[in-house]
Amino acid sequence: MGLIPKLLAGLVLLTLCVENGSGQYWSYGVRPGGKRNIEPLVDSFQEMAKEIDQLAEPQHFECTLHQPRSPLRDLKGALESLMEEETGQKKI
């Protein structure tokens, strides 16, 4: 086996070992053997549930800009009501 394939195989093995070894430290509350301490997890789930409940409450925003009624809006409403009356009369 040449020098380049040996170096490449060594680099691949080193990369895999470093990647697998560093993954254990990023886990939350992992003890040896893969066991977890449940108490901190329950607390964090309760905190997340409270945050979700707060986000689920509707927020009411008030518009501070006063916009006068548009005559086109009034005309549109009048035309819609006329069309509804005509279609209602034709159905009878």
Swiss-Prot record:
Key words of the record: Amidation, Cleavage on pair of basic residues, Hormone, Pyrrolidone carboxylic acid, Secreted, Signal
PTM annotation (Glycine amide): residues: 33
Name of the coding gene: GNRH1
Organismal lineage: Eukaryota, Metazoa, Chordata, Craniata, Vertebrata
Pyrrolidone carboxylic acid, modified sites: 24
PROSITE patterns: GNRH
Protein name according to UniProt: Progonadoliberin-1
Extent of the signal sequence: 1-23
GO molecular function annotation: gonadotropin hormone-releasing hormone activity; gonadotropin-releasing hormone receptor binding
Family, per entry: Belongs to the GnRH family.
GO cellular component assignments: extracellular space
Site (Cleavage): 26-31, 33-34
Cell compartments where the protein resides: Secreted
Organism, scientific name: Cavia porcellus (Guinea pig)
GO biological process, one term: negative regulation of neuron migration
Site location (Appears to be essential for biological activity): 26
Record function comment: Stimulates the secretion of gonadotropins; it stimulates the secretion of both luteinizing and follicle-stimulating hormones.
Predominant localisation class: secreted
